[in-house]
């Protein structure tokens, strides 16, 4: 029996989604692209179920393409696939972690990866103190959440 792959994507016509579909089919997967926001779930002691347009979905593997705007509900769908035993390329925890820049930096540091001095601030006043603490330029200033370089600024001096 051919393995069943679900690609979770809000954009089935996106180039990257189409290429994933083409390549997975070339390797013998039965591939479905499903909008994660069109999925319903049932959670129970037996692992639960996932439905799309009223029909149960079975997947051996899942490739989530969860955009920032649907991080929370999308990661819930991904977690349900995990609970049902599917191999998931990007786990729900990894998706959530990738959206939180401070937590991601903490995990990298805990794993022994070199990270730049990073300061998280709660207010503009704290930001000025952080600038004095770091003490040298250039600095990169980022919003605590976001993707693809949104709200990232380079401060030269």
Predicted feature residues:
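ATP-binding N-terminal substructure of ATP-dependent carboxylate-amine bond-forming enzymes
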Residues: 1-89, 93-94, 103
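Active-site nucleotide/adenylate-binding loops and adjacent lid/helix of ATP-dependent enzymes
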Residues: 2-10, 20-22, 57, 81-85, ...
